[in-house]
């Protein structure tokens, strides 16, 4: 098949080279962005009298027809044509003739590819934002549903202090809030228009980039044409966002795996979100959680891979940069899956609050509160720490816990203990006493939930703002 760039060559491209360099297998998903960019470019060319209105109309109509064919799965892509840009241009030229050959006037595949990816990433940011909000809503709903459940909080994966289950859920809410904030920067940098930069140095045709910017809904234009075609920072930033949100979901998945085990028995995942064993009939496996955990490393790989690819590239475009797309496309798909399925799992799981409380009642998670009790009576905290440590050791040897001791036992340990000690170190009191701003007391967690709802409302306003920007694309 003749190449659209083949004039300089005397030989056809080796089939192995075609297969190796082709990107149509993955960049075909940018067809809508490519067509929108081409329509805007053709419209601008006609406005500037670079092509005729008749050619513009033929190009726009032809591109609309092609989009309809791709939408319906009726378009046959060719590896020999390398990428989505050349596949569409070749079909357009076949369909409308000479006018199709004028579409690429004043444009390079370098700025064409860049503008496609910018528009694609903008859409992805909106989708990711909506998925984060839904996940945050699931966390708040679950925190409210189990608002009175107290569970062990852990350090070093050992029981440490009692916390409200809702407090634990809201910790993940805060992580996702930061993830949403990262999308603000990704969108800001994706919302810069590179079209008009040409191959690297701009255009000699008297194009109107400001007009094209308006047609494609970009907030601004790249100041420097060389930067425009070589910049992939916004892709790196999206992959960084993806890596962090997947890390947060992986930590949650790890906890869901542990909590759903017989050893913990804190939660039960819904049957719809688990799988079984081909040999062990009793098994109910948290495969989804395990896959989220596993796919996190894959997302990290995309980030590191692109950083490594870009680090040695001279300005401006190099074919290495084709490697930006598979990674970000896969990251988008992976994060989409992970956020949506985690939201469903959180909403569907059952929390075994009674067992969590029983675990706390049979443990030493209230030891810190016992030391705090002494410190508030004037005992230096380090001395109080030593006294309580000895008491815990005594209980371990006797096969009991602190709550099993009598008031007389406590007074034998230290004269500073009074009759109120058992109330002071009850699990409920341990939680209620931590009523500082970020603490786990019920009123604090309620405030966190209420603040979270306002955060979600603000995030939804931001998503609407993004949608408004994208809606300006004149397709």
Model-inferred region functions:
Residues 1-202, 207-211, 275-276, 287, ...:
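A helix-coil-helix interface module used to build multimeric assemblies
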Residues 1-37, 98-99, 280-475:
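Glycine-rich cofactor/substrate-binding loops
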Residues 38, 85, 89, 235-238, ...:
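Short runs of predominantly hydrophobic/aromatic residues within well-ordered alpha helices
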Residues 41, 62-69, 91, 95, ...:
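Generic, well-ordered alpha-helical scaffold segments in large soluble proteins
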Residues 50-51, 75, 264-265, 380, ...:
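Conserved hydrophobic residue
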Residues 118-125, 129, 144, 152, ...:
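Charged, flexible cofactor/metal-binding loops and thiol motifs
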Residues 140, 144-147, 188-191, 257, ...:
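Alpha-helical coiled-coil oligomerization motifs
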């Amino acid at each position: 098949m003749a190449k659209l760039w083949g004039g300089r060559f005397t030989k056809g491209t080796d089939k192995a080279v075609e297969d190796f360099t082709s990107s149509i297998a993955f960049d075909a998903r940018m067809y809508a962005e490519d067509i929108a960019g081409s329509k805007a470019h053709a419209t601008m060319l006609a406005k500037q009298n670079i092509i005729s209105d008749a050619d513009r109309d033929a190009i726009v109509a032809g591109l609309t027809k092609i989009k309809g064919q791709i939408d319906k799965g009726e378009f046959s892509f060719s590896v020999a044509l390398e990428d989505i840009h050349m596949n569409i241009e070749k079909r357009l030229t076949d369909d409308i003739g000479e006018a199709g050959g004028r579409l690429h006037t004043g444009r390079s595949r370098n700025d064409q590819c860049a503008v496609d990816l910018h528009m694609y990433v903008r859409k992805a940011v909106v989708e990711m934002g909506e998925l984060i909000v839904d996940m945050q809503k699931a966390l708040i709903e679950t925190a409210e549903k189990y608002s009175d459940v107290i569970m062990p909080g852990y350090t070093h994966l050992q029981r440490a202090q009692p916390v409200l289950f809702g407090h634990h859920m809201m910790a993940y809410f805060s992580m996702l809030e930061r993830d949403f904030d990262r999308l603000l920067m990704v969108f800001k940098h994706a919302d810069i228009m590179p079209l008009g930069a040409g191959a690297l140095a701009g255009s000699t045709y008297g194009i109107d980039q400001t007009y094209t910017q308006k047609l494609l809904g970009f907030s601004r234009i790249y100041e420097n044409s060389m930067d425009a075609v070589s910049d992939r920072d916004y892709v790196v930033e999206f992959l960084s966002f993806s890596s962090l949100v997947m890390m947060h979901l992986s930590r949650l998945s790890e906890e869901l795996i542990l909590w759903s085990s017989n050893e913990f028995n804190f939660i039960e995942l819904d049957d719809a979100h688990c799988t079984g064993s081909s040999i062990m009939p009793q098994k109910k496996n948290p495969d989804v959680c395990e896959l989220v955990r596993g796919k996190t490393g894959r997302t990290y790989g995309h980030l590191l891979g692109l950083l490594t690819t870009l680090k040695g590239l001279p300005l401006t475009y190099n074919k290495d940069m084709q490697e930006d797309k598979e990674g970000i496309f896969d990251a988008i798909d992976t994060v989409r899956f992970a956020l949506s399925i985690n939201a469903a799992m959180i909403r569907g799981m059952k929390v075994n609050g009674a067992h969590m409380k029983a675990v706390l009642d049979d443990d030493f998670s209230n030891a810190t509160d016992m030391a705090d009790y002494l410190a508030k009576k004037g005992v230096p905290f380090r001395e109080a720490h030593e006294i309580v440590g000895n008491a815990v050791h005594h209980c371990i040897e006797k096969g009991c816990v602190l709550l099993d001791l009598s008031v007389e036992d406590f007074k034998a340990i230290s004269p500073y203990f009074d009759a109120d000690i058992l109330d002071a170190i009850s699990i409920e009191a341990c939680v209620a006493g931590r009523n500082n701003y970020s603490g786990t007391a019920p009123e604090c967690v309620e405030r966190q939930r209420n603040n979270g709802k306002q955060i979600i409302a603000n995030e939804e306003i931001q998503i609407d703002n993004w949608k408004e920007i994208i809606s300006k694309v004149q397709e």
